[in-house]
């Protein structure tokens, strides 16, 4: 078995945090190596050390049997190591082809950009991934899932020997995911090595040959996937067995808090449902069914064109997100970096951004009260950060999600709308978020949980609404809901 890449004994420290402590990873030709660990385990840091974004404090990196120390992503990419990042990194006002070949445009013999060649090559890459869009389309016009496929096409364009995929399927549909898996199988057949970073256990057992686990920055072990179970893998990741993945809380629901009647708007058509105090209603459906649009419309981020929304028996009109907040409705976006967090600001500033009025007295901010409240939320949510002043963009994906949810809760809402609450979150942090959601439910909060993860919807919800083409196509009680029923309602069978 040929080893393409071998990382051994790597250490990396930041002020107040030892991010990596004897981290190891091997990548083999023609095999897929899963890299797993809870958020904050050091996966992203290790990849940044490999590609030269961070310098290592100790350890060795061998690539194609030579010791290497890359001075940046460009150097590692030119050497044949490509990384597909978890968060999108495209220029919205450029076309798909321009994004794929940015800085590497094809030129004619007289030095002009060869647009025909560039679009032909981009279209070939898109076809390989099963994407039907023209490469001349602007990236800003694509969905998050479609933009992710462009990122993958961009990485494939380098024909690298080692390809690192960081949560590549998080925003993909089942069809897009299967297309990606087919590409991975092709890459394996070409003797390339793949590093597959994911929190989705099902995918690890579907597509990966080997798995390496990090915990708290340390190398825990490398295993052959065919020789372990999900429970074995979870125990390696979190140091304990997780007998119950979805800790559903059974309790009597309270009064009707949100009453939505015949609402239409951007991507929404004649939607009606009720949401009670202390109840979790899941919203399921395929990508493009209108789930996110429903959440944003109720919050005030998208316009309502028809219908009525009543909150605690009072009709409300949320013409803007500020109206939504004022009326006690909070929306936590699926795109935490696009719609949610301000990455250059601190944990404290992000968390208290929408609730500064709670800390105001006679026109000035009570900073001590703000700091104490933020510290309480950091403790309650188990947010892994050196301190409240840490830049939120430096936190792991799961900890960023916790900050986003904490910010929403700090406004003391009546209704919490969670859009893909565990997107990009590992299995251990997922359970922490589920337990937090249960605490909110116990306190009487009304929760609308939008998710493409059917087991999550089935595991946590008291009722499930299924959306298709902007309408609610079905509603199921917890005891009647099954994955088969949800899928049938989502596709119109």
From Swiss-Prot:
Record domain ABC transporter: where: 5-241, 252-491
Keyword Cell inner membrane recorded: yes
Pfam families on file: ABC_tran (PF00005)
Stored Gene3D superfamilies: P-loop containing nucleotide triphosphate hydrolases
Record's catalysed reaction(s): D-ribose(out) + ATP + H2O = D-ribose(in) + ADP + phosphate + H(+)
UniProt: ATP binding residues: 37-44
Major localization class: membrane
Name assigned to this protein: Ribose import ATP-binding protein RbsA
Provenance organism: Haemophilus influenzae (strain 86-028NP)
Higher taxonomy: Bacteria, Pseudomonadati, Pseudomonadota, Gammaproteobacteria, Pasteurellales
């Amino acid at each position: 078995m040929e080893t393409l890449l071998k990382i051994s004994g790597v250490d990396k420290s930041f002020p107040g945090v030892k991010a990596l402590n004897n981290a190891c990873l091997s990548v083999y030709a023609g095999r897929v190596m899963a890299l797993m660990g809870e958020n904050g385990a050091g996966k992203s840091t290790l990849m940044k050390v490999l590609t030269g974004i961070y310098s290592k404090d100790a350890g060795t990196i061998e690539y194609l049997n030579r010791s290497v120390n890359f001075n940046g992503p460009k150097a590692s990419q030119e050497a044949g190591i490509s990384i597909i990042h978890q968060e999108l990194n495209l220029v919205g006002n450029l076309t798909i082809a321009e994004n794929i070949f940015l800085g590497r445009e094809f030129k004619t013999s007289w030095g002009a950009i060869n647009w025909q060649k560039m679009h032909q090559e981009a279209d070939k890459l898109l076809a390989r991934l099963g994407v039907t869009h023209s490469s001349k389309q602007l990236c800003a016009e694509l969905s998050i899932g479609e933009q992710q496929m462009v990122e993958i096409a961009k990485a494939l364009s380098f024909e690298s020997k080692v390809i690192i995929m960081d949560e590549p399927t998080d925003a993909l549909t089942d069809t897009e995911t299967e297309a990606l898996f087919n590409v991975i199988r092709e890459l394996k057949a070409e003797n390339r090595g793949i590093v597959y970073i994911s929190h989705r256990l099902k995918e690890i057992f579907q597509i990966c040959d080997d798995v390496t686990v990090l915990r708290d920055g340390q190398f825990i072990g490398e295993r052959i996937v065919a020789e372990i179970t999900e429970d074995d893998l979870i125990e390696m990741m979190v140091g304990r067995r997780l007998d119950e993945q979805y800790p559903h809380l059974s309790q009597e629901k309270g009064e009707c808090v949100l009453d939505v009647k015949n609402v239409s708007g951007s991507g929404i058509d004649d939607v009606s449902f009720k949401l009670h105090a202390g109840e979790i209603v899941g919203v399921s459906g395929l990508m493009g069914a209108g789930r996110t649009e429903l959440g944003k419309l109720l919050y005030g981020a998208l316009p309502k064109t028809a219908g009525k929304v009543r909150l605690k028996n009072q009709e409300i009109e949320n013409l803007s997100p500020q109206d939504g907040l004022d009326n006690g409705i909070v929306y936590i976006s699926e795109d935490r970096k696009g719609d949610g967090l301000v990455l250059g600001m601190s944990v404290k500033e992000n968390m208290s951004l929408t609730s500064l009025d709670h800390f105001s007295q006679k026109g000035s901010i009570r900073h001590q009260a703000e700091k104490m409240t933020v510290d309480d939320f950091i403790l309650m949510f188990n947010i892994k950060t050196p301190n409240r002043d840490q830049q939120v963009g430096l936190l792991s994906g799961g900890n960023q999600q916790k900050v986003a949810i904490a910010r929403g809760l700090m406004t003391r809402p009546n209704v919490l709308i969670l859009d893909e609450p565990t997107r990009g979150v590992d299995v251990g942090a997922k359970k922490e978020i589920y337990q937090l959601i249960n605490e909110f439910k116990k306190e009487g909060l009304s929760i609308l949980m939008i998710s493409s993860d059917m087991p999550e919807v089935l595991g946590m919800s008291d009722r499930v609404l299924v959306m298709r083409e902007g309408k609610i196509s079905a509603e199921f009680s917890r005891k009647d809901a099954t994955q088969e029923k949800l899928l049938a309602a989502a596709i119109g069978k």
